[in-house]
């Protein structure tokens, strides 16, 4: 499936999602409009129940809307069936999850190769291995390709997950709370990888409830009550954190993050 290089990578219009439980209807999304251009780094925020997880599932082709349109990389995926959405997912989206989702008895390089097997790309085993090792090198894991997950730290396991998401060269990286299981220092290092990938031209969509993590993006979309409540550029994205050097004693303090608006906490939103 081909797409126009001039088309936005994500184009959502009047998107609604209604869940029906017996006679009860729950309106999770109520007419969302959202455009993400190629090469953007967008953080989507919102408290529990805001609709951000539903929006993520639709962006990731894990679910489809009740009404409205969603074009991914120029392709209208709004009404595709499950098998068609699976094909689009494998081709267009690289997922990174909070829980890493690595196969415990499989080496790092083999974990990264999995999407190449599912994608039916026709690659030989040596070609898959080469692409896997290149992806691991790209996220700073050269020399650890043959390690099992149990031999890697949490941050290193998440790097493997990012490499796995990258290996098919997807249109977007979709990261769902990728630092949720990491300490603050390791979180900074992992988010720095996303910044590096974005600087190299990769489109990144990050789902998070943490303002400190969203501050690394270049744009923040805040979802509330099933609608896009705020959609603003960040004046100055938070600086990358090379090896967490700024957190070490004697290191320079990081500059304050300049938001063009105040990001409300979940507690403030639900009041």
Question: Model-derived features: where do they sit?
Answer:
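ABC family nucleotide-binding domain
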Residues: 8-217, 222-223
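ABC-family P-loop ATPase nucleotide-binding domain
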Residues: 1-18, 233-271
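Flexible, glycine-rich phosphate/dinucleotide-binding loops
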Residues: 213, 229, 237-238
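H-loop (His-switch) and adjacent beta-strand-loop-beta switch element
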Residues: 220-233
